[in-house]
């Protein structure tokens, strides 16, 4: 088992806090919420996190998600006002240098590809958009993907390839890639196992596994099987990998599971749930790759209302952030007993 310890509660947002994003290198955190603001927090050098900046002029409605570019210079924010704002902190101060328009309804999620050359967004309008970063302040729409039949909740890029995953109210996950012959983006696999809305998804460090969480109160682990794999899983065209559900975590959550994060440093999975709890799971050592088992190693009543977001720090092992309907942002430290 392990121990989850509260390090600090960051107060400042008014109303629900929807999203949080760690800077890829620096001890900096961005959060966003119902109050239409983005708040930037930083470690003051002593381990205490302090407010640095409030960005309040980019959106006219709730801000649902924030994501830093891989280089750490740009911050993208997705809003219920149907736009995505791109913030540039080159000069040290944040400036909104682009507003991406095109979605017809609330934008729910935003994600940068590993190279930073592509940005994905998704919306209540059932679409996923892929944007090419032409220049630092120019973004061109490369694809509009209308594969889902309902509200799209989350987009997440593969950590090593230009492969995109999206999760939807239609209970499915779609996987997309570009056909290099004609530059068209399309779905190459539909992952359908959940019984209700898929709220969030997260790749592991290798990108060969994907975790998903749902309104059906479960977490599912999906495994990629490439052509000629040792397990004998057939790939229909002999070229395209297929993804299979290899593990279902059920009985741990008592409400909808709203977010999931797979730590790239430790392999631990964290979930944020509608029962106000945060839970940590670890793969059981020695469990087979195509039939893995996971155990819950920590749980904490983290908030007084729904836990909306959980995200592991990309730079500090065991550090994670949670956000909630209760208006708080909390920083936690997980320590393993083993």
From Swiss-Prot:
Give the stretches traversing the membrane: none
Pfam families assigned: WD40
GO annotations of cellular component type: cytosolic [4Fe-4S] assembly targeting complex
* Keyword Repeat in record: yes
WD repeats: from-to residues: 12-51, 58-97, 102-141, 147-186, 193-232, 234-252, 253-291, 302-338
Alphabetical UniProt keywords: Repeat, WD repeat
Against SUPFAM superfamilies, the record matches this protein to: WD40 repeat-like
Which PROSITE patterns did the record assign? Answer: WD_REPEATS_1 (PS00678), WD_REPEATS_2 (PS50082), WD_REPEATS_REGION (PS50294)
Q: Which GO terms describe its biological process?
A: iron-sulfur cluster assembly; protein maturation
Q: What does this protein do?
A: Essential component of the cytosolic iron-sulfur (Fe/S) protein assembly machinery. Required for the maturation of extramitochondrial Fe/S proteins.
Belongs to which family? Belongs to the WD repeat CIA1 family.
- Full protein name: Probable cytosolic iron-sulfur protein assembly protein Ciao1
């Amino acid at each position: 088992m392990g121990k989850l310890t509260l390090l600090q509660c960051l107060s400042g947002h008014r109303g629900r806090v929807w999203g949080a994003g760690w800077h890829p290198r620096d001890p900096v955190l961005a959060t966003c919420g119902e109050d239409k603001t983005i708040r930037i927090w930083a470690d003051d050098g002593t381990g205490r996190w302090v407010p640095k900046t409030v960005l309040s002029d980019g959106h006219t409605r709730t801000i649902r998600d924030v994501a830093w570019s891989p280089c750490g210079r740009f911050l993208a924010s997705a809003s219920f006002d149907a736009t995505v704002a791109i913030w540039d902190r080159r000069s040290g101060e944040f400036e909104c240098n682009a507003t991406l328009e095109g979605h017809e309804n609330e934008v729910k999620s935003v994600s940068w590809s590993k190279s930073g050359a592509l940005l994905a967004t998704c919306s209540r309008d059932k679409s996923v958009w892929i944007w090419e970063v032409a220049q630092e302040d120019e973004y061109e729409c490369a694809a509009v993907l209308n594969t889902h039949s309902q509200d799209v909740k989350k987009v997440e890029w593969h950590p090593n390839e230009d492969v995109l995953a999206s999760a939807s109210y239609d209970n499915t996950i779609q996987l997309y890639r570009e056909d290099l012959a004609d530059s068209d983006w399309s779905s190459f696999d539909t992952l359908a196992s959940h019984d209700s809305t898929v709220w969030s998804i997260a790749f592991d460090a290798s990108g060969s596994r994907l975790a998903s969480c749902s309104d059906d109160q479960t977490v599912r682990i999906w495994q990629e099987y490439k052509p000629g794999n040792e397990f004998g899983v057939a790939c229909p065209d002999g070229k395209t990998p297929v993804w299979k559900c290899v593990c279902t975590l059920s009985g741990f959550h008592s409400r909808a599971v709203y977010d999931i994060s797979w730590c790239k440093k430790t392999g631990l999975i964290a979930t944020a749930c509608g029962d106000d709890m945060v839970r940590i799971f670890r793969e059981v050592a020695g469990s087979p790759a195509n039939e893995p088992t996971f155990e819950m190693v920590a749980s904490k009543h983290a908030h007084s209302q729904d836990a909306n977001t959980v995200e592991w720090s990309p730079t500090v092992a065991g550090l994670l952030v949670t956000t909630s309907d209760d208006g708080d942002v909390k920083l936690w430290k997980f320590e393993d007993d083993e």
